[in-house]
Curated annotation (Swiss-Prot):
Protein name: ATP-dependent helicase/nuclease subunit A
Start and end residues of each UvrD-like helicase C-terminal domain: 517-799
Taxonomic path: Bacteria, Bacillati, Bacillota, Clostridia, Thermoanaerobacterales
UvrD-like helicase ATP-binding domain mapped to chain residues: 4-480
Primary role: The heterodimer acts as both an ATP-dependent DNA helicase and an ATP-dependent, dual-direction single-stranded exonuclease. Recognizes the chi site generating a DNA molecule suitable for the initiation of homologous recombination. The AddA nuclease domain is required for chi fragment generation; this subunit has the helicase and 3' -> 5' nuclease activities.
Chain residue ranges for the region called Disordered: 535-554
PROSITE patterns per record: UVRD_HELICASE_ATP_BIND, UVRD_HELICASE_CTER
UniProt keywords, alphabetically: ATP-binding, DNA damage, DNA repair, DNA-binding, Exonuclease, Helicase, Hydrolase, Isomerase, Nuclease, Nucleotide-binding
Record's subunit section: Heterodimer of AddA and AddB/RexB.
InterPro entries: AddA, DNA_helicase_UvrD-like_C, DNA_helicase_UvrD/REP, P-loop_NTPase, PDDEXK-like_dom_sf, PDDEXK_AddAB-type, Restrct_endonuc-II-like, UvrD-like_ATP-bd
GO molecular function: 3'-5' DNA helicase activity; 3'-5' exonuclease activity; ATP binding; ATP hydrolysis activity; double-stranded DNA binding
CDD domains named among the record's database cross-references: DEXQc_UvrD (cd17932)
Biased amino acid composition, Acidic residues: 545-554
Family: Belongs to the helicase family. AddA subfamily.
Length: 1230
């Protein structure tokens, strides 16, 4: 037994017997040590020892199981050293290798092999790895749908599903929906019953006045929205009453607060009175005019809060109360047959997939659990009354205790298995569960924290508890006191039952463990570094100033680079700037919510500042040139009649043809595919023919090898015979390139270790990885074990601890892809579908969809809150938080508003509408004494109140992007280098040396003009350049990228409520989707716009902004009539055009060989018998006589568009027009 000093709760958790025991262990509380000590004491108790093989210890991972077995063995060996020859200890050591210290899946697999005969399963089954399972699942899914389509005639529900949810061009959306529904159902112990119940969600016979899940969910959704509206209106009222505020608004706002609160009071009653009240409710049409001299910022704040409340209530009214409740319910009833058919498809696919696996003697991880349930459940068991089988009863008697680690991460199937093998419900309970629900972060793996929470709330905490007891381990032995106080300060205010699913009360908060290291000086304050954006970039990337939407993501990438630079500066400060290292790099970890797409940027910035760093980059492998080249060759070996892979191989170093030689190959056979042209060119002799003939000979050998031999051997033979492996080794980064090729070889070997064979299937598997966004990441240049800064995701850091944690990218928006499907899935509610009428081309969310979406959103928010908790509790010595906040002043105003409540926790609307970690943490700091730098930016700064319990200390730093750019402009070691140079003796004068130095310093790079010009340019940028040239403006070098002017502030918005950029985007949507064969009168266009709004192509605000009269005038004119009668029309037509670089970049006339690719989208192109007509939509405001100036401004752009059209379609563009939306006219470009 351990000699360490256990706390009282730890001792109770170790020694409590004959109860179901839930140990709620906070971060750093030593839960693993408690679990190991409990096992050791049970097996080494002299009075009542338990054989170690009669304990079932379930861990989350194989590594955790191995570590626990190792710890138990070491403890027994230590005891044996103290008591040599003690029979009990020797006996337990002999039993330990057979002990059930295992993962849940390993336990299930062992049970299946032992009792396979009960379910007619081959005991020699093999567990499929993820690669094998993914291929087989996809193949089975495709074959399953092919079989369904053979009998689709006479199955109207299946036809409806294909039409409504199948996608525009194929049925992949429906296939993925069925596959996802099957996988989701398998997380339930009774998947068939769950599918039947899920399909019936929304079909509540009590309607919206009952207490069914749909009615309850709608009331909760409406009530939450009204609560948020009341909060916004009260904030507006407070701003109106503030000194200098628009006091004249106060009476109207007070009445609106009261009226909204009355609406909220009706939510618990019947639906029809609530609906009537909603329809009758209205805001004051126009607030009184504010007196002169009123504080403009307070007035704007008041208007902004009131506007948000109005929009919120209007959205609720339009979504739920514009139609009668019978209409809402009738939509669900109409979808009932289709949802039941969808559930049946998922069940039938599951059976087809199970059959395919059994044919190969395979099982997946879900099979392990469900087959195990078949063995453990007696025949006749139901979800309401599960009965243990004789096998389960025997295991209950055999296991003296069942101990479960990381209990917060199990799912419902695993819970049922544990319930069946333990005596959880018996007279002598024996289930021990340990975990921390605040660290349950595996929802994406269908973990179910509600199972932990159910027991957390139900179990008693006293020593005299009956058969179930809860013990809280709150002492943290990991972090310094300053970090513990900071974690408590944040989560006391943000983790609530309404949003975080748990109250962060005295039972949940952390207590300093009191070790000397923790208490020494209590540690430095927690640092917070906030980074604002340049004025042209806001919280949402601003569009261009023009009427065309900006499709560039440059601003987002720049934000990542800026924050990476900020973090690099922090690391350099920690490590010591003068060469004396105060914190080793290996002690520093940078944590992010997700590293995909960002870790590479951080690595590059760290490398630039000479900071060694390591990250498992999950992207970039398949884009590596060497990997693309070999994969192209494998595609050609599989099927040489693929033009693009074949051309890529011929152009690559594997063959080495140039562009002119490829053109010559194409000319050898102009009619056939490219492979036929290669064969023809190979027979024409000459050097080119000889090269191609040699390639074809090798290709035929490889194709023969692919049919008969090993795939891995084929790949290595390609490396060896072509010398390509050695070739890439000689390129820059050669070691990494060779590592990438070895990884491809290893992947092929792993693939061949499965039940699959063949090159085609391997390539299909690679395609599945790429389509699913799964990448291997390039081979890293540094190892994780070296003295490097580690960059990892928060999930990768779970269970680990680090001396210094930098939690970066806290401004990242929460990513919630589960909320965007046409059919949403929820474990308790079931299916939430869109209502779709394919014939009428109508599609919109049902009430059930809204309810399911809101529940999923709340659960995902709770998950994000737990992820933040995990991140902040990884630090031992120092915790540093960084984030980009867009326009910092606006963000601080938002946080100031959020922090305005006086309660111990932040208001529920604030917590529920957070979009990032910053939206939770910063309002807490706004009310803290150390948050003064934030409050100075706010309109109204409340005194820092804090809370009586709050002993946290913070250090807040606000950074301007300009500071980072200036710091990045110089080498970090420049100052030291210059100082060293100053100390050197002067060099003796030498005329020849002077001349050489002069020549060297006077040299100019001959291609500097090219270096500042991009190889690809957007049509929007070309348009800007042409417009600048037309206006006689001086061109800005391309090295300084164009930045859009800042978005208009809210108080300058037009009456329509849209900025010019947003209006331009909305008009483009309308002109793209208008039915030109339909009614283009004023009423007809209004009807079509209403249809676009209903299908959610437009928001209500955008739809109201569309001027149907001007559009009708356009289409009634000559050009509009020609457009309606055209031979064909193409809208939003993308193009790429290669042009001489000097046509775009003045000053490059001396480089006629250089080319630039122009990429753009043509608004409209239509054909008439004698040629093509090109039309570009413009929403610019035009003054009297301004049409000609506008034509001059855009002439260069439309010339370029016309060249692109003529190059691609080989037809003449006879006319070019500007469609001037604001004047309702068309302007021809001469």
């Amino acid at each position: 037994m351990s000699s360490r000093n256990w706390t009282g709760p730890q001792e109770a958790a170790i020694g409590c017997r004959e109860k179901n025991l839930l140990v709620a262990a906070g971060a750093g509380s030593g839960k693993t040590a408690v679990l190991v000590e409990r096992v050791i004491r049970r097996i080494s108790d002299p009075a009542a020892p338990v054989d170690v093989d009669r304990l079932l210890v379930v861990t989350f991972t194989n590594a955790a199981a191995a570590e626990m077995r190792k710890r138990v063995a070491e403890a027994l060996e230590r005891e044996l050293e103290k008591h040599p020859g003690m029979p009990l200890l020797e006996h337990q050591l002999r039993l330990l290798p057979q002990a059930d210290i295992t993962t849940i899946h390993s336990f299930c697999a062992e049970l299946l092999r032992r009792y396979h005969y009960l379910i007619d399963l081959d005991p020699e089954f093999r567990v499929a790895d993820e690669t094998e399972a993914a291929i087989l699942r996809q193949e089975t899914l495709e074959e399953f749908f092919e079989e369904q389509y053979r009998v689709i005639t006479g199955d109207p529900d299946l036809e409806f599903l294909v039409e409504a949810y199948g996608g525009e061009r194929d049925d992949l959306k429906l296939q993925n929906l069925v596959s996802g529904l099957h996988r989701f159902a398998r997380s339930n112990p009774w998947p068939e019953a769950w599918l039947a119940r899920a399909a019936a969600f929304g079909a509540d016979p009590q309607g919206l006045d009952g207490d069914g899940p749909l009615a309850w969910g709608l009331r909760d959704l409406v009530g939450t929205g009204l609560e948020a509206a009341v909060f916004e209106l009260r904030a507006a009222l407070e701003a109106a009453k503030a000194p200098g505020g628009p006091a004249v608004y106060a009476d109207a706002l007070a009445a609106e607060v009261e009226g909204t609160a009355r609406l909220a009071g009706l939510v618990a009653g019947d639906w029809e009175p609530l609906r009537a009240a909603f329809l009758a409710f209205g805001f004051t049409p126009r607030l009184p005019a504010a007196r002169a001299g009123v504080d403009q910022e307070l007035k704007d704040l008041c208007s902004r809060c009131r506007k948000k409340a109005k929009e919120r209530i209007q959205n609720l009214k339009e979504t739920f109360f514009a139609r009668r409740p019978e209409e809402l319910l009738s939509e669900m009833a109409a979808l009932g047959p289709a949802m039941r058919r969808l559930a049946a498809l998922a069940a039938d696919f599951g059976e087809a997939y199970r059959t395919a696996k059994l044919a190969r003697n395979l099982v997946d991880f879900a099979d392990l659990e469900h087959y195990c349930l078949q063995i453990l459940l007696a025949p006749g068991s139901t979800p309401e009354a599960p009965v243990p089988s004789p096998v389960a009863a025997g295991l209950r008697e055999y296991y003296v205790e069942v101990l479960v680690d990381e209990y917060q991460d199990i799912n419902a199937v695993q819970e049922t298995i544990l319930r069946l093998v333990s005596r959880q419900d018996a007279a002598a309970p024996n289930l021990f569960m340990v975990g921390d629900v605040k660290q349950s972060i595996y929802r994406f793996r269908l973990a179910e924290p509600a199972l932990f929470l159910e027991k957390y709330r139900a179990f008693d905490t006293g020593e005299d508890a009956g058969g179930a007891r809860r013990i809280d381990l709150s002492h943290n032995f990991r972090s310094r006191e300053s970090i513990i106080h900071a974690v408590n300060a944040v989560f006391r205010r943000i983790m609530t039952p309404a949003v975080g699913e748990l109250a962060y009360d005295t039972a949940a908060e952390l207590v300093c463990g009191g070790t000397p290291a923790q208490l020494e000086g209590s540690g430095p304050p927690v640092e917070v570094h906030l980074l604002g954006a340049p004025t042209s970039v806001g919280r949402d990337t601003a569009g261009t100033a023009d009427d065309e939407p900006d499709r560039s993501d440059e601003a987002d990438l720049t934000a990542v680079q800026r924050e990476a630079r900020l973090v690099a500066g922090i690391i350099r400060r920690l490590a010591g700037l003068g060469g004396e290292c105060t914190v080793p790099y290996r002690d520093i970890v940078v944590l992010m919510r997700a590293t995909t797409g960002k870790a590479g940027t951080y690595l590059e910035e760290f490398r630039r500042q000479n900071i060694p760093a390591y990250a498992k980059v999950g992207t970039g492998y398949f884009e590596a040139v060497e990997v693309e080249t070999v994969l192209s060759l494998l595609k050609v070996i599989d099927n040489p009649h693929q033009d693009i892979p074949l051309a890529g191989v011929l152009r690559s170093p594997l063959v080495g043809l140039g562009a002119a030689e490829l053109a010559a190959v194409r000319l050898a056979d102009k009619e056939g595919d490219f492979f036929r042209a290669v064969v023809a060119a190979a027979g024409q002799g000459g050097r080119l023919g000889a090269v191609l003939a040699g390639f074809l000979e090798r290709l035929e050998k490889w194709r023969s090898q692919a049919r008969c031999g090993s795939l891995a051997d084929l790949i290595w033979d390609v490396y060896r015979t072509t010398g390509y492996y050695d070739y890439v080794g000689g390129l820059p980064g050669g070691a990494g390139r060779q590592a990438n090729l070895r990884a491809l070889y290893d992947r092929a070997r792993q693939y061949e270790a499965t039940a699959f064979r063949g090159l085609f299937r391997f390539l299909r598997f690679i395609e599945l990885l790429q389509e699913g966004g799964q990448d291997l990441g390039p081979a890293p240049a540094l190892a994780e074990s070296e003295n490097v800064v580690r960059i990892m995701s928060i999930h990768q850091a779970k269970g680990l601890e680090f001396p210094v944690v930098i939690l970066a990218d806290m401004g990242r928006r929460f990513y919630m892809p589960d909320l965007n499907g046409e059919v949403l899935l929820h474990k308790d509610l079931g299916l939430g579908p869109y209502f779709v009428d394919p014939g009428a081309r109508v599609s919109h969310p049902t009430a059930a969809w809204h309810v399911v979406r809101e529940r999923l959103r709340r659960e995902q928010l709770a998950e994000e809150m737990r992820i933040l908790y995990v991140a902040m509790t990884r630090a031992r010595e120092r915790l540093i938080l960084t984030g980009s906040a867009g326009r910092l002043e606006q963000a601080v105003l938002r946080w100031s508003h959020a922090a305005a409540g006086d309660g111990e926790t932040l208001p529920v609307p604030v917590l529920a509408e957070a979009e990032s970690f910053l939206d939770w943490v910063m309002p807490v700091l706004m009310a803290h004494p150390d948050g003064e730098p934030l409050r100075r930016l706010a309109v109204r700064s409340r005194p820092a109140a804090g809370t009586p319990k709050d002993r946290s200390r913070w250090e807040v730093h606000l950074h301007r992007p300009e500071d980072l750019e200036e710091a990045a402009g110089a080498d970090p070691d420049t100052a030291a280098v210059l100082e060293s140079l100053r100390r050197l003796a002067p060099i003796p004068a030498d005329g020849g040396l002077d001349e050489a130095v002069h020549r060297a310093l006077s040299w100019h790079y001959p291609w500097s003009a090219l270096a500042s010009c991009g190889a690809k340019i957007s049509a929007t940028e070309v348009k800007r350049r042409f417009a600048a040239a037309a206006a006689g403006e001086e061109e800005v070098p391309a090295v300084f990228p164009y930045r859009a002017p800042p978005a208009r502030p809210a108080f300058l918005e037009t009456a329509r409520g849209l900025s010019p950029q947003a209006f331009g985007r909305a008009m483009h949507v309308v002109l793209q989707h208008l039915d030109l064969a339909g009614d283009l009168s004023v009423d007809g266009i209004r009807a079509q716009v209403a249809g676009l709004e209903e299908r959610e192509f437009l928001t209500a605000t955008e739809a109201r902004a569309i001027d149907a009269e001007k559009l009708a005038g356009l289409f009634a004119g000559g050009l509009g009539r020609r457009l309606a009668g055209a031979l064909w029309v193409r809208r939003e037509w993308p193009f790429c055009l290669v042009v001489p670089a000097h046509e775009i970049y003045p000053g490059l006339e001396g480089h006629p060989e250089e080319r630039v690719m122009v990429q753009g989208i043509i608004d409209c192109l239509f054909a008439e018998p004698d040629g093509l007509v090109l039309v570009d939509y413009k929403t610019d405001r035009v003054g009297p006589g301004g049409e000609a100036a506008l034509a001059d401004r855009y002439r260069g752009q439309l010339d370029l568009y016309a060249r692109a059209v003529e190059a691609v379609l080989r037809r003449r563009v006879k006319e070019r027009y500007l469609f001037l939306v604001m004047t309702g006219s068309a302007q021809i470009i001469q």
